[in-house]
Regions:
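Beta-strand elements within well-structured catalytic alpha/beta cores of enzymes
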Residues: 1-3, 13-14, 38, 81, ...
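Solvent-exposed loop/turn segments at secondary-structure junctions
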Residues: 1, 29, 97-100
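Short, structured active-site-proximal loop/turn typified by the sulfatase FGly-forming signature C/S-X-P-X-R
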Residues: 3-37, 41-45, 91
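His/Asp/Glu-rich, glycine-adjacent segments
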Residues: 42-169
Length: 169
């Protein structure tokens, strides 16, 4: 809302140099469809993402939180940018459907679910070795602080620090 910009001088300065448009609500208002809206500029009826999981009728299987980018059925911002300027470097940090996307740099949580029921912390990255470098410098991504009752600024700080580190590489 324009009135909120008075309380945010940095964002206000950014908006003063650019453009803004009203945000229209989307349905369903859950993580994957909303992120796909932002990455494509399209509504769920165009990009095809309507939930955080899928039910495959043929196999009677439910697929939840697998996060492969092929589910998005519309060009994304980095695809459009690369069409116009192939030399441009693009990055996407933490949208849940970014595995296998066309961005040059990608980072998103992808914990390993072990056969014994335990979980090992990990992130999917492009290039593949990027998470090892980020982990060596920043420690593992604090997944327990990303959502749920233990959510905290720790996960946000890691995301910001990792993006800054990757941008400098």
């Amino acid at each position: 809302r324009p009135s909120d910009l008075d309380q945010m001088p940095c964002l206000s300065a950014l908006m003063g140099a650019g453009q803004r448009q009203p945000l229209r609500a989307s349905f369903p208002a859950v993580t994957w469809p909303v992120q796909a809206n932002m990455l494509t500029g399209c509504r769920p009826s165009q990009h095809g993402v309507v939930g955080n999981g899928f039910y495959w009728r043929e196999s009677h299987e439910v697929e939840m939180w697998t996060a492969w980018n092929e589910k998005i059925q519309a060009p994304q911002v980095w695809d459009l940018m690369h069409q116009d300027s192939p030399e441009l470097t693009s990055a996407v940090w933490f949208p849940m459907l970014s595995k296998g996307c066309g961005a040059d740099f990608v980072c998103m949580p992808a914990p390993v679910h072990n056969p014994d029921g335990s979980e090992s912390l990990w992130c999917y990255t492009t290039p593949t070795e990027l998470y090892g470098d980020l982990r060596d410098e920043l420690g593992h991504f604090p997944l327990k602080n990303f959502w749920g009752p233990l959510s905290s600024i720790d996960s946000t700080a890691w995301i910001v620090d990792s993006a800054v580190m990757a941008a400098g590489s």
